[in-house]
Regions:
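Subunit-assembly interface segments of extracellular/virion macromolecular structures
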Residues: 1-713
């Protein structure tokens, strides 16, 4: 506890405290045990789909192909239908609560990192050079920001992802903050969740052992459109022109689905809005008819009936993170000794024999210390190589060998390239470990400005987030804990750090520890070792405003070296750490790239930067997920990250979020397409949503301490 200087009136006396006083208080160590607690898992954003063809490939450790979001219902099994209006990553896929019986069966497609697009039509075309893939586009009036989904290709149409804010028609935009490349917006259309009518993933041949692509329609809920009532009726002519008495459809988006029920028909009609006419009427077109879902044809005679819109069953505002919150805060330790985890795995490249029998064992899953679950419609599905799906029932399923072997009978005979979606119960759970890496460095040598590069020594680049002038500067790795310093060069050379020289015989290059603290006995300065340069010299980053004094005794806090400081070599680089904040990239559904964000009202740097930081690394970990046990106890006080918009303390969760791989490209790492989750540290299995685990844990109890000033001061 730090007590500041001041005067207090105690027992009739004025008591002066001349300087700051530090009082050591034992940390609270009182704990409460929770011997058994249920932890439920939701896992990702649920999009309900039907009319399914094929099976999607999860993206938690494979970014070969994404899930593409389209604005029309499917009409092809090997491409998307309509306009591409967004992208997402697949987490899991399973039947939604009932057995598969055909195209009308609903499935739960669990997604993460869902992004919908904004489409701009510019006043003049942009080339690939002017608008490279992943370019950052900013509206000069609105301040809206987005990243290009593709390069310009001499087109006036630009689609943006990761959009924040709202672009305005007529405003100017600037590309990659280059004032020489600007355009104005002729028209703008913002796509949202309500525009998603189908999904597509180009699995074949991009992903090994997936014989077909994945295609599905979104399940559409009925919604009365704004400005209309449930009793309003639509008048549909044989030509497809539709009106509503006393009402106008102006403002309705094309590709909206109109739902209506005709007399003596058991299946609803679905028609697509192809055009909104100037008189407020709409032109309707057909969609594919799906048994048990919709009749997509236009009526053959004039029809007057009530109607609604069809909107997908998804809500991004209720995004569920890929982690599970434990019941209490300030968890101190966790007991997984009796816990298990229900996980999913696609078994690939299976075949049925001549009798329609398929058998596989635990080795096919690649998961150890597990057994297959008993049959349930949500737990198992069989997807043939031609994209069709087996109507799988419990009498076809045989579990044997203590849950190690599954046999499925009654399949189509002599089929290959079968994908079986399975569910297992994993035991012997283990927390992944995070290694605390100290004093790592990143040099930023790129600039957005093409002039004076001979004076700055930098290279002009277009990738936003990789240049010194950018408001957000990517650290190109995830899970950064703290930034120790940001240093700007004063010339064309790289920035340097202060160096301390000590007497010979200490073998600092082998005996000192990278990242340990050094304390000056006279100056009270504290610094962190950033490099072990030689047997007598180290490089440092100051952690205090006080500086070391030549000749004083300094102490290396971990290696217990105590010696006299012979020489201080100041770098001359500018310390500009205070103009930045750190965004650690702790998103609800994944570990994103950590980044520096320049504070408002500060001018951008003009020369090369050197950034020194500490981070967590999980590259050698072999566990199943992250928990409080993933962190060293000494990190518990200030170095535990907070997850997502609700700032959930990571040590109070079971954390399944995938981690982005290190970035080394030239485009912006902040664009959807440049986030990659192919790191081997990410799990090869998925946590089955809507399941739970039983764990034990302890958590710290709060306490209140009182500091009393007596008359002795």
């Amino acid at each position: 506890v730090k007590i500041s200087a001041g005067t207090a009136y105690v027992k009739g006396f004025d008591v002066d405290i001349d300087g700051t006083v530090i009082i050591d208080v034992d940390k609270p160590r009182d704990k409460r045990e929770v011997s058994s607690a249920l932890v439920p898992y939701q896992m990702g954003t649920i999009l309900k789909v039907n009319n399914v063809f094929g099976v999607p490939a999860p993206n938690i450790n494979d970014d070969t192909v994404f899930v593409e979001l389209y604005n029309q219902r499917t009409s092809s099994n090997n491409s998307g239908t309509g306009e591409l209006v967004g992208q997402a990553r697949c987490y899991s896929f399973a039947v939604s609560g009932s057995a598969y019986t055909g195209d009308s069966t609903e499935w739960d497609l669990h997604l993460f990192d869902v992004q919908t697009f904004t489409r701009l039509v510019l006043n003049s075309a942009v080339s690939n050079t002017e608008l490279p893939d992943a370019s950052r586009v900013r509206g000069l009036s609105s301040g809206a920001i987005g990243y290009a989904t593709a390069s310009g290709s001499a087109s006036t149409i630009v689609k943006l992802t990761e959009v924040t804010g709202v672009f305005m028609q007529g405003e100017q935009v600037i590309i990659n903050e280059d004032p020489e490349i600007s355009r104005s917006i002729k028209t703008v259309r913002t796509f949202g969740i309500q525009d998603i009518k189908s999904v597509y993933q180009a699995c074949h041949p991009a992903i090994t052992n997936y014989a077909t692509d994945f295609v599905a329609d979104t399940v559409l809920q009925s919604k009365v459109p704004t400005g209309f009532s449930i009793t309003d009726k639509i008048n549909i002519g044989v030509s497809g022109i539709a009106t509503c008495a006393g009402k106008s459809f102006a403002g309705i988006k094309t590709d909206t689905i109109i739902r209506y029920q005709l007399p003596n028909e058991s299946t609803e009609r679905f028609n697509r809005v192809t055009e909104v006419l100037s008189d407020g009427s709409i032109s309707l077109g057909t969609v594919a008819s799906i048994a048990g879902v919709c009749n997509g044809a236009l009526p053959s005679t004039l029809q007057i009936t009530t109607f609604s819109f069809g909107v997908p069953n998804i809500n991004l505002n209720d995004n569920t993170g890929l982690f599970a919150k434990i019941g209490n805060s300030n968890v101190s330790d966790i007991d997984l000794s009796t816990a298990n985890l229900v996980v999913g795995k696609n078994i690939l490249s299976e075949s049925s024999d001549g009798n329609g029998v398929l058998t596989f064992d635990l080795a096919a899953s690649g998961i150890s210390s597990a057994f297959y679950e008993s049959f349930d419609e949500e737990r198992y599905s069989v997807h043939y190589g031609d994209g069709s799906i087996e109507n799988l029932t419990s009498d076809q399923f045989v579990l044997s060998n203590n849950g190690q072997t599954v046999t499925i009978n009654g399949l189509t005979a002599s089929q290959s390239n079968i994908v079986v979606s399975t569910t297992l119960k994993k035991q012997a759970l283990k927390s992944k470990q995070k290694d605390y890496i100290r004093s790592e460095k990143l040099e930023v040598t790129k600039t957005a400005v093409g002039v004076n590069t001979s004076l700055t020594g930098m290279t002009k680049a277009t990738g936003y987030g990789l240049r010194v002038e950018d408001r957000e500067i990517s650290l190109n790795k995830c899970d950064i804990v703290k930034v120790l310093g940001v240093f700007e060069s004063i010339d064309a050379n790289s920035p340097t750090l202060d160096k301390l020289t000590f007497p010979s015989g200490l073998a600092l290059n082998t005996n000192a520890i990278l990242g340990e603290k050094i304390t000056g006995s006279t100056s009270e300065a504290i610094a962190q070792v950033s490099s072990l340069l030689s047997a007598t010299q180290v490089e440092i980053v100051y952690l205090t405003s006080e500086k070391f004094v030549q000749g004083e005794v300094v102490n290396f806090n971990e290696s217990n070296i105590s010696t006299t400081l012979q020489e201080i070599t100041e770098s001359g680089s500018l310390n500009i750490t205070n103009i930045f904040d750190l965004d650690k990239g702790q998103r609800d559904q994944f570990y994103d790239y950590s980044r520096l964000i320049r504070k408002s009202n500060f001018a951008p740097p003009k020369r090369k930067l050197l950034i020194v930081y500490d981070r967590y690394d999980a590259g050698t970990s072999t566990g199943d997920f992250f928990t409080v046990s993933s962190y060293d106890e000494e990190r518990y006080g200030k170095d535990i990250p907070n997850i997502g918009k609700n700032n959930v303390r990571a040590s109070d969760t079971i954390d399944f979020r995938p981690r982005v791989s290190g970035y080394s490209g030239d485009e912006s790492p902040f664009a959807f397409q440049n986030r990659t989750f192919s790191s081997s540290v990410n799990s090869s299995f998925i946590v089955t949503p809507n399941e739970s685990s039983i764990i034990g844990y302890n958590y710290y109890l709060p306490r209140i301490d009182k500091v009393v000033l007596d008359d002795d001061g």
